[in-house]
Amino acid sequence: MKKAFISVGEISGDNYASQLVKALPDFMWVGITGPKMREAGVETVEKLENISVVGLMEALPKYFKIKETFKRSVEILDKGIDLLVVVDFPGFNLKLLKEAKKRGIKTVYFIAPQVWAWGKGRIPKIAQYTDLLIAIWPFEKEIYTDYISDSFRVEYVGHPILDIIKTEETEESFKEKIGIEKDKKIFGLLPGSRESEVKTLLPILLSSAEIIYRKREDLHFVIPSTPNMEENVKQIAGSKKVPLSVITVKDFRHPSYEVMKHSVFLNVASGTATLETAIFGNPFLLVYKVSPVTFFIGKMLVSIDYLGLPNIIAGREIIKELLQKECNPESIARWSLRYLEDPEVYERTKNDLEKVKKALGEKGAIKRSADLIKELSLS
């Protein structure tokens, strides 16, 4: 049985990676894992929850942990690993690809960094250290055209997000299980999965919820949380005077997706969750706030007009983005109420989100990816 190392640095990547692992049962898997990968049987070198960061300033407290995790990962590459699969997380994974390539280990970039948005300088390194890049956007292959060779392949498979999005509850059963009255409408709050995001964004979202609730007492707010952040979320939410539920995988198999599906409106932190929410078709606001230094550096590096994937795909702002100073309780409440109280804006947004979903291609990206990886491992 071939042994594969898989490296994931974010919760969204954990979703995709766990499905990929399940589609490749003939490999023995070890790596940097999230909860779903561990559930799928991947042996853990380090939990991604311990090294996941966003932004330069936010990364500093975890620097030594990340460095130590990298050292241990390289040591494992020396112990008979046949294949390395990495998912996004370029600051860490590009270095790991380089070490694998030195050792003659076959390498796969499954869900590559968004170099079309920022970090185009990484393209030569990605091509140098990667045997197979699995592209999830139709335009990605063109980006790498000048680098494709016998030692670097790029294959487009479609977006795996369509394979992993699943829900099990009706609106009625969802409300019943968390004790929400039938006539109440659900308002989703998704502050992100990283500790730094939750600590920054959740207090803002909850203060906004208090403003919204004063005008809309028919709402019940629901926060889906990862298990490792549940206590933090409940502690932050404890003092707020709005109808509020915090749910995790202990309550539902797919808590975030249930909230996305059954909410009349949502406030969503920038990231993969914005694309997931778009697929369910319910209008939402994109919110984000990082340190001024991180934001300044990001603005210098990014070559696109929007932060949210739905807006990038649409080529215009179909979802309002409230960033940095605009990400405050008053602005979030004002924009949320505008969507909720203007049927024309609400329906237009739903129609725009349906077009975004259609642009993602067909289901089956996970199986197509698994087939490509099998082929590489046998070559």
Swiss-Prot record:
One of its GO terms (molecular function) is lipid-A-disaccharide synthase activity. SUPFAM superfamilies: UDP-Glycosyltransferase/glycogen phosphorylase (SSF53756). Transmembrane segments: none annotated. Pathway: Bacterial outer membrane biogenesis; LPS lipid A biosynthesis. InterPro entries: Glyco_trans_19 (IPR003835). Keywords: Glycosyltransferase, Lipid A biosynthesis, Lipid biosynthesis, Lipid metabolism, Transferase. The keyword Signal does not apply. It comes from the Bacteria. Signal peptide: none annotated. One of its GO terms (biological process) is lipid A biosynthetic process. One of its GO terms (cellular component) is membrane. The keyword Cytoplasm does not apply. Disulfide bonds: none annotated. Its EC number is 2.4.1.182. It catalyses: a lipid X + a UDP-2-N,3-O-bis[(3R)-3-hydroxyacyl]-alpha-D-glucosamine = a lipid A disaccharide + UDP + H(+). NCBIfam families: lpxB. Condensation of UDP-2,3-diacylglucosamine and 2,3-diacylglucosamine-1-phosphate to form lipid A disaccharide, a precursor of lipid A, a phosphorylated glycolipid that anchors the lipopolysaccharide to the outer membrane of the cell. Belongs to the LpxB family. This is Lipid-A-disaccharide synthase. It comes from Persephonella marina (strain DSM 14350 / EX-H1). The gene is lpxB.
